[in-house]
C-alpha cells in the first residue's frame, strides 16, 4: 500500500508483499503462529471465566432486551423490534461451525472480523453489532463479543414468547482472524466451485456457497428447485452436526420470526465493511436506494415476511407453508422467491415500517424444500400436529447450534446452563473415588514397565488416546478413555490388534490395583493410559542418559459406550497423523502429507517449535505407525529419547533421493558410498526443506541441544496429554 497525497489508500493488486505471496507453493507454517501469539490486549493476565462470573447476568439480559425494543432512526427496527435481526446475527455467528474439522462456530466472536464481517450472507449484521455496542461498552470485559453475539439471539427469542433451552457463556474473543480455517477454493463471493461432478461437497466445508452460511436461499446455483435444495440442505446441515429433525426444527423455528430484505436489486449497495471507505468506520453495504434503511433495506435481495406475526412465537410458519400452495417468481430484489397462489394470504401481514400498509407473506426455496422432500415433510407435519414437540425440538437444536463448538459441559458458565447432559457434549462421568498420589503413581509406573509393553507401544497408545483432541471445538482427548470404545478402538491409525493387547494389559493393571485397595483410591484407565506414556518416556530418557520426570496430573475418568455418539466421533478419526508418520489410503482431503501435519498440529494447538520437537521425539521413540515401516526413525538407538533425528536429517554427508515419481517416500544415502542410511517420508524431509522448520531443527540438532530437546519434548508431550483437562485451567 502507498499513501497518496490526497490521503486516500491505493491498493496494490498484483505485487507480492509477503513470502507466501512470493512463494505460494511453500508450506504454510504461519498458521501455527496463532497458537504462540497472544494478539489481544490483555497481556496474559486476564481470566475471562472469572470476569464472567462477576457479571450481573439478569441486568445484562434486561439491557439487551431494552436495546432490542428501542428503535433507532439510523437503522429502524422492523416491526419496532430488533429481535429477528439479533436472531440472524446469532445464527450466523454460530452457523459457520462444521463437524468435519470442528472449525468455525461462535467462539472467538469472529463475525466481527474479516472475512466473516464482509460475507454477503452477513450483510447488515454490522448494524446489529453496532446496536449492541452500548451494552458491550457498559459491561466491558465481563462479557465477550463472542458470548454477547449469541446471547442476544436467545434474549430475542425469549422477548418474543419462546422458551429457550438455556445458555452458557465462556467464549473468549479473538482479535485476529483464524487463518487455519479453509473457507473454500473460490476467489469470488457467492460462487460454488466446491462441488465435484457427482455434486459432492469438498471436505472439510459445510457451507455450499462461498460467503453464505449454509445454502443459497434461492436454491442451488440460484435455481429455484426445492428438491435439489433439500439435498443441499441435508448435506450442509449434516456437515454442521445436525440431523434431519434438528435441521427442520431450526429452519421452521428460525423462520417463524422476522423477514428478509430485498426492496430493490443489490446494484444500489456499496462495498462491504472491509472494503468500505474509512469514513464509514467499519460499516458496509451503504444503500443508495431510497432512504437506504427501513422499507428500503436491501440485504439478501429477497423481500418479505414468513408469517403474519413476525415478532411472536407461534405456529404461523408451518401453517402457512403446509396449508397453502406457493409459486415461484422474482421479487423486487431480482431474486427467486415464492408467493402464495391463494388470495387468502393477500395483505395479511402488517408492513414492517408503515402500520397503514400490508404485505403478502413469502417463502424461500429452502422453505418449500421442507414441504417437497418426503422426509422433511413428515417431520414438519409431525411438528404441526405436536406443537410442544416442535418447541422442544427447536429449543434443543438452537441450543446445540449455539454451543456445538464449546466442547464439554464443564466449560459452560452462567446461571442458565441446563442440568441435562446431552450426548453431543461428549460427557464423561465425575470421579467417584479418591485420586492416586505420588506413591501410587510410582507403584503403577513400575507395574507398567514390568509388562511386555514396549516403550514404543506405550507411547503410541497414550498418543492415540490424547491426540484425538481438536482445539477447534474442544472435542476428543484422553479423558474418557474412549480409545477402548467404538469407534476409536478400530481406527486404522491406532493399529487395532496391537492397541487391543495394550488395553488388555493396562486394564489388568488397573483391575489388580483397584481390587487391592482397602481405601477409596482408584485409578481410571484414562489416567493409566497417559501414565503409561509418561513411564515410557522417562525410561527412554534415562536410557539416553537423562533423568527426567514427566508431569502427570490424575483426574481423568472413563466414559461408557452409551455416553459416546459413534457417528459424531467418526469425524475425529485421524486420516493422517504426521507425528506417527501415518496417512490413510483415502484421506478426506487432497493435501500433501506435510499439509496434513500442519493441520493436525494446529488442531492440537501446537506452535512450530512444539511441532518440531514432538516429531523428532516420536521418531526417536520409534513411535511411528506400522505402515511407516521404519520411515523417519533416523537413529541406531530407537526407543531412547535422543536428538538423532535432527542430527542425521541435517547431516550434509547425506543426500535424499525419491523412490517414486510422486515423491512421497525417500531414501537417505551416504554421499560418498551411496549406502542407504535411512528411509524418510515427505513429513520427515519437510523439517530440512522448509526454512522455518529447518531453523528449528538446527536448534535441536546442535551439539549442545540434547538436554533442551528432552526438556522441550516433555513439555510439548505433557501439553498434548492435558489438552482436554479443562479442570486444570
Curated annotation (Swiss-Prot):
The active site is at residue 92. Residues 1-20 are annotated as: Disordered. One of its GO terms (biological process) is cellular response to hydrogen peroxide. Binds 1 heme b (iron(II)-protoporphyrin IX) group per dimer. Residues 10-20 have a biased composition (Basic and acidic residues). InterPro entries: Catalase_peroxidase, Haem_peroxidase, Haem_peroxidase_sf, Peroxidases_AS, Peroxidases_heam-ligand_BS. There is a cross-link at residues 214-240 (Tryptophyl-tyrosyl-methioninium (Tyr-Met) (with W-91)). It is an enzyme of class 1 (oxidoreductase). Keywords: Heme, Hydrogen peroxide, Iron, Metal-binding, Oxidoreductase, Peroxidase. It catalyses: H2O2 + AH2 = A + 2 H2O; 2 H2O2 = O2 + 2 H2O. There is a cross-link at residues 91-214 (Tryptophyl-tyrosyl-methioninium (Trp-Tyr) (with M-240)). The record marks 88 as: Transition state stabilizer. The keyword Ribonucleoprotein does not apply. Its cofactor is heme b. Belongs to the peroxidase family. Peroxidase/catalase subfamily. Homodimer or homotetramer. This is Catalase-peroxidase. The lineage of its organism: Bacteria, Pseudomonadati, Rhodothermota, Rhodothermia, Rhodothermales. The gene is katG.
Amino acid at each position: 500500500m502507498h499513501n497518496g497525497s490526497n490521503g486516500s489508500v491505493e491498493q496494490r493488486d498484483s505485487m507480492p508483499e509477503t513470502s507466501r505471496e512470493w512463494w505460494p507453493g511453500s508450506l504454510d507454517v504461519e498458521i501455527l503462529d496463532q497458537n504462540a501469539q497472544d494478539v489481544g490486549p490483555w497481556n496474559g493476565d486476564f481470566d475471562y471465566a472469572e470476569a464472567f462470573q462477576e457479571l450481573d447476568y439478569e441486568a445484562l439480559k434486561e439491557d439487551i432486551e431494552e436495546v432490542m425494543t428501542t428503535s433507532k432512526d439510523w437503522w429502524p427496527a422492523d416491526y419496532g423490534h430488533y429481535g429477528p435481526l439479533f436472531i440472524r446475527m446469532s445464527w450466523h455467528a454460530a452457523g459457520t461451525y462444521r463437524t468435519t474439522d470442528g472449525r468455525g462456530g461462535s467462539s472467538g466472536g469472529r463475525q466481527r472480523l474479516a472475512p466473516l464481517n464482509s460475507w454477503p450472507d452477513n450483510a447488515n449484521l454490522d448494524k446489529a453489532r453496532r446496536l449492541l455496542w452500548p451494552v458491550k461498552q457498559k459491561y466491558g470485559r465481563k462479557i465477550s463479543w463472542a458470548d454477547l453475539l449469541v446471547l442476544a439471539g436467545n434474549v430475542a427469542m425469549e422477548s418474543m414468547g419462546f422458551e429457550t433451552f438455556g445458555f452458557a457463556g465462556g467464549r473468549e474473543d479473538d482479535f485476529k482472524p483464524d487463518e487455519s480455517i479453509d473457507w473454500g477454493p473460490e476467489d469470488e463471493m457467492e460462487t460454488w466451485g466446491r462441488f465435484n461432478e457427482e455434486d459432492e461437497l469438498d471436505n472439510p466445508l459445510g457451507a455450499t456457497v462461498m460467503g453464505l452460511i449454509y445454502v443459497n436461499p434461492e436454491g442451488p446455483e440460484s435455481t429455484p428447485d426445492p428438491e435439489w435444495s433439500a439435498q443441499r440442505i441435508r448435506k450442509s446441515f449434516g456437515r454442521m452436526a445436525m440431523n434431519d429433525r434438528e435441521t427442520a426444527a431450526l429452519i421452521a423455528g428460525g423462520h417463524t420470526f422476522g423477514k428478509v430484505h430485498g426492496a430493490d436489486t443489490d446494484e444500489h449497495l456499496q462495498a462491504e465493511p472491509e472494503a468500505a471507505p474509512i469514513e464509514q468506520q467499519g460499516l458496509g453495504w451503504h444503500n443508495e436506494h431510497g432512504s437506504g434503511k427501513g422499507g428500503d433495506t436491501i440485504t439478501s435481495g429477497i423481500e418479505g415476511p414468513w408469517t403474519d406475526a413476525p415478532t411472536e412465537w407461534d405456529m404461523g410458519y408451518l401453517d402457512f407453508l403446509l396449508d397453502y400452495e406457493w409459486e415461484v417468481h422474482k421479487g423486487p430484489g431480482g431474486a427467486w422467491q415464492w408467493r402464495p397462489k391463494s388470495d387468502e394470504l393477500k395483505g395479511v401481514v402488517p408492513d414492517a415500517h408503515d402500520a397503514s400498509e400490508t404485505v403478502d407473506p413469502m417463502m424461500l426455496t429452502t422453505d418449500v424444500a421442507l414441504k417437497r422432500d418426503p422426509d422433511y415433510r413428515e417431520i414438519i407435519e409431525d411438528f404441526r400436529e405436536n406443537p410442544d414437540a416442535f418447541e422442544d425440538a427447536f429449543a434443543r437444536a438452537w441450543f446445540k447450534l449455539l454451543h456445538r463448538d464449546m466442547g464439554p459441559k464443564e466449560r459452560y458458565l452462567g446461571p442458565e446452563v441446563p442440568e441435562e447432559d446431552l450426548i453431543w457434549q461428549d460427557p464423561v462421568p465425575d470421579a467417584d473415588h479418591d485420586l492416586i498420589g505420588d506413591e501410587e503413581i510410582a507403584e503403577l509406573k513400575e507395574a507398567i514397565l514390568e509388562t511386555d509393553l514396549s516403550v514404543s507401544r506405550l507411547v503410541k497408545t497414550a498418543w492415540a488416546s490424547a491426540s484425538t483432541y481438536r482445539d477447534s471445538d474442544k472435542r476428543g482427548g484422553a479423558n474418557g478413555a474412549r480409545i477402548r470404545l467404538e469407534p476409536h478402538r478400530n481406527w486404522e491409525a491406532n493399529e487395532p490388534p496391537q492397541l487391543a493387547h495394550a488395553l488388555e494389559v493396562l486394564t489388568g493393571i488397573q483391575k489388580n490395583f483397584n481390587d487391592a485397595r482397602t481405601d477409596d483410591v482408584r485409578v481410571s484407565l484414562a489416567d493409566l493410559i497417559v501414565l503409561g506414556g509418561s513411564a515410557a518416556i522417562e525410561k527412554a530418557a534415562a536410557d539416553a542418559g537423562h533423568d527426567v520426570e514427566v508431569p502427570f496430573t490424575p483426574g481423568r475418568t472413563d466414559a461408557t459406550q452409551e455416553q459416546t455418539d459413534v457417528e459424531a466421533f467418526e469425524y475425529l478419526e485421524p486420516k493422517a497423523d504426521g507425528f506417527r508418520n501415518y496417512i490413510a489410503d483415502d484421506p478426506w482431503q487432497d493435501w500433501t502429507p506435510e499439509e496434513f501435519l500442519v493441520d493436525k498440529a494446529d488442531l492440537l494447538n501446537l506452535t512450530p517449535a512444539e511441532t518440531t520437537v514432538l516429531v523428532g521425539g516420536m521418531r526417536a521413540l520409534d513411535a511411528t505407525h506400522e505402515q511407516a515401516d521404519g520411515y523417519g526413525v533416523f537413529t541406531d538407538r530407537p526407543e531412547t529419547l535422543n536428538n538423532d533425528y535432527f542430527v542425521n536429517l541435517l547431516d550434509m554427508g547425506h543426500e535424499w533421493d525419491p523412490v517414486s515419481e510422486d515423491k512421497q517416500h525417500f531414501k537417505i544415502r551416504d554421499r560418498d558410498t551411496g549406502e542407504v542410511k535411512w528411509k524418510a517420508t515427505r513429513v520427515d524431509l519437510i523439517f530440512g526443506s522448509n526454512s522455518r522448520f529447518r531453523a528449528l531443527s538446527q536448534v535441536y540438532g546442535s551439539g549442545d541441544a540434547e538436554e533442551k530437546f528432552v526438556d522441550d519434548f516433555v513439555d510439548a508431550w505433557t501439553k498434548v496429554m492435558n489438552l482436554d483437562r479443562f479442570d486444570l485451567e
